[in-house]
């Protein structure tokens, strides 16, 4: 501030992430954007939430505080799906965990309020965006109020926020009180009166939703149907004491020119140099040599919050903008010739799903790709193919990878195989990661994913294309266990599919109920909010562990869970020595095997080695067992290989009889 000659900042941005001046980080985009509009902005990254003075180091801002938990919801950042503390934080210098609080946006806002009673506070970022109205919180297992009320903030700028934050800043700068800023799209505010609220749809009250989960399901689906900036209505959520939280319709999507402007701001493209001594910020490694080409997604997966945050309308950058950034990347001293990614939420979405999307918005009660591709869907990869070719032709670029995810059903829907050939020939390095998620059509329907037959068609096309171009390349499917609707029989079906593939997935995602997804609503309410029909929800931790273990049934550590799961599913036909079996039966005496918790293994029962409960037993008995065991071993050695083969046969026969 002294170097710039600033006595007071217009805004102070409080972030739960370390400061990284790169367009993959929300705080970098918002602060750079405000700067280009003439506002003075300072950043306090990861303040000490136990010390209220930590947010005073830049003084009181003239217009307000901007608060974000960071690029991730702080609870997802801190905890695994089993609610265990994660060991590292990629958004903190050195990957150190614990530099931000749980529910960071609420904690930071309350910290500010302790010091600055009347200074405006505007919440932003994904944590505030997905908790803008009443929401189910998995970590406390409760229905929580709007984050606006718990935080004491004045406004929420939800979604990506470029349009709304500039309008908010200009309104405050013109002297409008923050309590009177009720007219900006993409914002949420609170009020004691609805006299000035027009054209609003009244949602179920918070207290009613706490008493009746079906009321929450209805409220959630109403919110889901109003995420479109063209057709979305103003929503009102009532609370006690005549208090209302009002959500204005979403902000309009950015045009191509606006996207170019945002990503063309003068970012330093790395973390603050003060972090160098700690080893830097790990998250930069994933994005430093990557290009963000689009935003939004019309895929509509039930477990994804993108509809609530970025929306279903595609927003893309021009080729010129992307090529300029790529050339800038090649000048980095540690650039090795590889562009790691060119994409966004879905790499191969580079245009609106249909003609009407940019003028009338997306359809309220139907999806573009689910359950079948819409007749109006425009499937065209030509622009993306051209972009990839242009990037490959840049000097110093050896290879361009695509890591964002390819929407395989969109590839299958394309009548031309040009993109698939381009992908396999130039942009895959041995393995292509795709996300079928499951194979059970019952589960896939609830996930909002295409039928398994569509994925199998893609597999055939992919393999055929690789044969054509003489490449040995594989598919690595992302799979999810314990999604609402997944019964044990569905988990077994998935395990059988993995068996047929002949490999064991290293990474398995257990369903994680994060805020503001259809799947999370199912998890909490037990119904599909789109149909209000009951949905089976695997909530018991042990059942979830069994479903997860089935996907990795080859891992010896999972034997007991897999055996239990197969018994529960009445699929003991999958225990044996035949090729179709997932696991073998317990090995017989003298052979090593795993221990069932709380039970003795076969070794303990017959080895003669005294356990804790064997103490005080007759020493002669113990000696006799050792002698018998020794005789058996000698006998086995003397009988030779024929006896061994005969014994294996008898074991198989015993199993078949059972």
Protein language model annotation of sequence segments:
Residues 13-16, 29, 44, 48-49, ...:
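Conserved SAM/AdoMet-binding glycine-rich loop
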Residues 14-17, 278-305, 330, 338:
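N-terminal pre-triad scaffold of radical SAM enzymes
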Residues 26, 45-240, 247:
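Glycine-rich beta-alpha loop elements in corrinoid/cobalamin-binding modules
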Residues 50, 179-230, 242, 251, ...:
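Terminal amphipathic helices with adjacent charged low-complexity linkers/tails
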Residues 73-82, 130-132, 162-167, 192-195, ...:
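Flexible glycine/acidic-rich beta-alpha junction loops that bind and position SAM and/or redox cofactors
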Residues 154, 262, 297, 322, ...:
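Conserved, mostly hydrophobic/aromatic
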Residues 172, 180-255, 489, 504-505, ...:
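C-terminal accessory regions of radical SAM enzymes
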Residues 591-658:
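Intrinsically disordered, Lys/Arg-rich low-complexity segments
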